[in-house]
Amino acid sequence: ISFSSCMAKINTPEIPQSFNQNAVVTSGDFSFECEICKNEESVSVTVKNTNALGLVMTYDGENVNFKYNDYSQNILGENFEKGNTAIIVYDVMNALCDENTKKHIIDGGVKYEGKTNFGEFILVQNDNSTLKSLAFKNSDYKIAFK
């Protein structure tokens, strides 16, 4: 009698070095739609509705740049509020490489649990490597990716 062993291979989605996804950002009673674009150097958030329609916030790990129509200004990131969406996404994506960040295979994707300056986060990624959601344990701030 011969027994063949078969191992189920779990395909883990790659952590995207760059992506471009629409999302809804919610903090308390306030929410806005945006496009979040990450490349190897920075994260940009383009606001798609509310009074800030068209505002682009870009964070490169040091500076936050605000661009609105012809207006553009750089602000040192450390002097800026940690709740800025571009800073939050940038820091979370960098934290995914941290050895303390936990990775769990879940139905339909992967759940990452880690920590940034903003707090402890839970990031859920779909099987196709797109992002699904980002939430923080001690905050009502969350991002639902489309």
Where are each of the predicted segments found?
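Short, acidic/polar N-cap/turn motifs at the starts of alpha helices
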Residues: 22, 33, 54, 63, ...
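C-terminal motif of bacterial Sec signal peptides marking the signal peptidase cleavage site
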Residues: 2-5
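A short, Trp-centered hydrophobic/proline-enriched beta-strand micro-motif
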Residues: 13-30
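Short polybasic amphipathic segments
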Residues: 23, 62-67, 131-134
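Gly/Pro-enriched, hydrophobic low-complexity segments
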Residues: 44-49, 99-146
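Bacterial signal peptide processing site
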Residues: 7-10
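An acidic-aromatic
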Residues: 36-95, 139-141
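Residues that act as N-cap/strand-start positions at coil-to-secondary-structure junctions
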Residues: 28-30, 39, 51-53, 106-108, ...
